[in-house]
Curated annotation (Swiss-Prot):
Chain ranges of the FMN hydroxy acid dehydrogenase domain: 1-380
Catalytic activity: (S)-lactate + A = pyruvate + AH2
Keywords: Cell inner membrane, Cell membrane, Flavoprotein, FMN, Membrane, Oxidoreductase
Cellular component per GO, a single term: plasma membrane
CDD domains per the UniProt record, alphabetical: alpha_hydroxyacid_oxid_FMN (cd02809)
UniProt xrefs under HAMAP family: L_lact_dehydr
Enzyme class: oxidoreductase
Gene: lldD
Annotated NCBIfam families: L_lactate_LldD, PRK11197.1
Cofactor: FMN
Organism of this sequence: Salmonella typhi
The protein, known as: L-lactate dehydrogenase
């Protein structure tokens, strides 16, 4: 199979993975309007072509939280990554490390902090939720710090899980889910051998280190579902500051006032994100939310963005709309499921090449030169959010 784009990896992942796993990462909340809009809105951002600019000394390098990145991209925290390839977090982290960009380990990763961190040359980032069990949160923060994690990504848009209808149809949840997953695995022997049999243990490593070994993955998921905390407030973040003195990034910001609150709190960064369309369907795409947030806090706090990014052009678009760096989620999961570390490394190479083409043809020699001037019109001005059509497309 010829791989030339994220869409090729998506198609390959759909063939490789049991449906319950493919649709878990590919799907979103409710009717998936926001999921689709994440991609569609970003694709409508028109780049401004410039010529005869002598682009021979182009550079993608940037700095974030005193770390040098080879390009303004980091791998986002993705739960159950180790179910998409054997010890998937280790493989994805290795690809990011070799590329010179950060890898973010999810709270609900299969591989624990202690398995992933020692394999890397650069410090990884760690993502954490606010949970009712504050003992677990403190334990996770202490372990992340001991392992040398440099940056905490604090996810705040999940006080309760979103309703993901596709999961009930795919076998991730719903009636007879365990039996359906079993037969799906039987019908996908490559995955069953590589991950199902040889990728064990199939637990949530960061949680099992705290709770001990449960009887099955469902036990972890049940514990986690009962621990999401709808009472979350800025006071919880103040408590976390007692145990974490490194850079803290607040993930899940879609409103300028929340961004201002993050600045007032003293956060080091925010992620403009709708959780990849997996939480509240019908909210703004990240591309639509980003310009107003950048207008409110640009220069006061580092701005990261995710949701809908599929290629290097999308990275340039997000930066032109106001982001300093972007996070890749689904795109790298598709590549990981297809070809492990090699797939993720190849995807990152593709994104780098696409960024270089986009920057060369828009006249931006460095990341700092990508701005609103790189666009024909900003998305919010060229297509008002209230008038944007709802149309079908690939999952975001």
């Amino acid at each position: 199979m010829i791989i030339s784009a994220t869409s090729d990896y998506r198609a390959a992942a759909q063939r490789t993975l049991p449906p319950f796993l493919f649709h878990y990462i590919d799907g979103g909340a409710y009717a998936e309007y926001t999921l689709r809009r994440n991609v569609e809105d970003l694709s409508q951002v028109a780049l401004r072509q410039r010529v005869l600019k002598n682009m021979s000394d182009l550079s993608l390098e940037t700095t974030l939280f005193n770390e040098t990145l080879s390009m303004p991209v980091a791998l986002a925290p993705v739960g159950l990554c180790g179910m998409y390839a054997r010890r998937g977090e280790v493989q994805a982290a290795a690809a990011a490390d070799a590329k010179g960009i950060p890898f973010t380990l999810s709270t609900v990763s299969v591989c624990p902090i202690e398995e992933v961190a020692p394999t890397l040359k650069r410090p990884m980032w760690f993502q954490l939720y606010v949970l009712r069990d504050r003992g677990f949160m403190r334990n996770a923060l202490e372990r992340a710090k001991a392992a040398g994690c440099s940056t905490l990504v604090f996810t705040v848009d999940m006080p309760t899980p979103g309703a993901r209808y596709r999961d009930a149809h795919s076998g991730m949840s719903g009636p007879n889910a365990a039996m359906r997953r079993y037969w799906q695995a039987v019908m996908h022997p490559k995955w069953a051998w590589d991950v199902g049999l040889n990728g064990r243990p199939h637990d949530l490593g960061n949680i099992s280190a705290y709770l001990g070994k449960p009887t099955g993955l469902e036990d972890y998921i049940g514990w986690l579902a009962n621990n999401f905390d709808p009472s979350i407030s800025w006071k919880d973040l103040e408590w976390i500051r007692e145990f974490w003195d490194g850079p803290m990034v607040i993930k899940g910001i879609l409103d300028p006032e929340d961004a201002r609150d993050a600045v007032r709190f003293g956060a080091d960064g925010i992620v403009v994100s709708n959780h990849g369309g997996r939480q509240l369907d019908g909210v703004l795409s990240s591309a639509r939310a980003l310009p107003a947030i950048a207008d409110a806090v640009k220069g006061d706090i580092a701005i990261l963005a995710d949701s809908g990014i599929r290629n290097g052009l999308d990275v340039v678009r997000m930066i032109a709309l106001g982001a300093d760096t972007v996070l890749l989620g689904r795109a790298y999961l598709y590549a990981l499921a297809t070809a492990g570390k090699t797939g993720v490394a190849n995807l990152l190479d593709l994104i780098e090449k696409e960024m270089k083409v986009a920057m060369t043809l828009t006249g931006a020699k460095s990341i700092s030169e990508i701005s609103g001037d790189s666009l024909v019109q900003e998305l919010g001005k060229s297509l008002p959010a209230a008038l944007a059509p709802m149309s079908k497309g690939d999952a975001a």
